Amino acid sequence: MNYEETLEYLYNQLPVYQKVGGTAYKEGLDNSLSLDKYFSHPHTRYKTIHIAGTNGKGSTSHLLAATLQQSGYKVGLYTSPHLVDFRERIRVNGEKISKQYVLDFVTKHREAYEPIQPSFFELTMMMAFQYFADTNVDVAIIEVGLGGRLDSTNIITPVLSIITNISFDHMQFLGNTLEKIAAEKAGIIKKDIPRSEEHTSEL
């Protein structure tokens, strides 16, 4: 496959939430944990900061990544969705992941991950984790995709958990009250791990 064919495979062969909606959502962490085991837990090779919330998590992720980079750290950044280019999702010091890395990752490991039947998000998340390990980042900013407690990214043990503003979103998955939605997003909070939370007046 070339790069364009690789993207076509990712978009058309794996369930993508933006294309097929809720049928792409895989509740639980089993797939993520299976992928993580196969790749030998790449996220343990650098520090991580986990960011959840309804509004502001993307801008917070980019701002924090830029601040850490200016302080001299080599910084990975994983966000979603992308606006134009798939590679916007995975960056190191502001530079997008290379097309060759995307191609090699998908083709090299295809026989291992296809039996797991990962979603688009689960596989691209693991691509990011492995890329950050391969490029020896000091710290990676990891933005939650959906919710928090059962989000694919919630296999990491971060040095800091951040929850930005919370409002109604993805109610079919997270619940129909702010309290239920907040509880799902608070699922990224780990015992004895520092956290930062933005106050939501309705709660």
Feature-to-residue mapping (PLM):
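Short loop-to-beta-strand entry elements in the cores of soluble alpha/beta enzymes
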Residues: 190-197
